[in-house]
Amino acid sequence: MSSMQETIINAFNFRHATKEFDPEKKVSESDFHTILETGRLSPSSLGLEPWRFVVIENEDLKEKLKPYSWGAQKQLNTASRFVIILARKNVTADSEYVQHIIRGIKKYEESTIPAVEDKFNNFQTNFHINDNERTLLDWASKQTYIALANMMTSAALLGIDSCPMEGFDLDKVTEILAEENVVDTEHFAPSVMVAFGYRKEEPKDKVRQPAEDVIEWI
């Protein structure tokens, strides 16, 4: 095994879902910037980046979220950094957002845009993504998990612990974030939370199914 391969595998063995962090140990600005950049630079279906990363630093807001975030009880108060990843709603070919991406960011030639839109529409139809608002949001949320995984992996490579969390009351958390002007509910919904910091205690040994049970060669 090469040194790079060993570094990668060691990082994955190091990473675990940290339930409680050492509140005295802080993730540096430069390390956290790197973690956020790996999220921002992550791949997404059709390169549409249907996400937003909200860094929660306000302690009062954390306290408001806590009663409705049963999966983040210890993490909210002990993690050095706490992020809520939002998924974008109604990402369709004719939406203002997608038009911004294909015209303003990707800068497709005007003559090619109708073909791009047709391809996008066909893809969403074939996968039943555009069946309704819920299926559109579920698809966007899938993309946020790609960014989430990359952020946690980069953190592990930096020796930083993390914990992803779905354990929250979606409606109440959305309501609180909207009241605090953190999220525009017309365009976004909370997808997943993730905390970063340094473990308070050493975890139990990692347990996974053997490779032959989860990998199949055809």
Curated annotation (Swiss-Prot):
GO biological process: 2,4,6-trinitrotoluene catabolic process
Organism: Staphylococcus haemolyticus (strain JCSC1435)
Keyword annotations from UniProtKB, A to Z: Flavoprotein, FMN, NAD, NADP, Oxidoreductase
EC number: 1.-.-.-
Listed SUPFAM superfamilies: FMN-dependent nitroreductase-like (SSF55469)
Record-level GO cellular component terms: cytosol
Official protein name in the record: Putative NAD(P)H nitroreductase SH0546
Pfam families reported for this sequence: Nitroreductase
Family named by the database record: Belongs to the nitroreductase family.
Recorded GO MF terms: oxidoreductase activity, acting on other nitrogenous compounds as donors, with NAD or NADP as acceptor
Listed cofactors: FMN
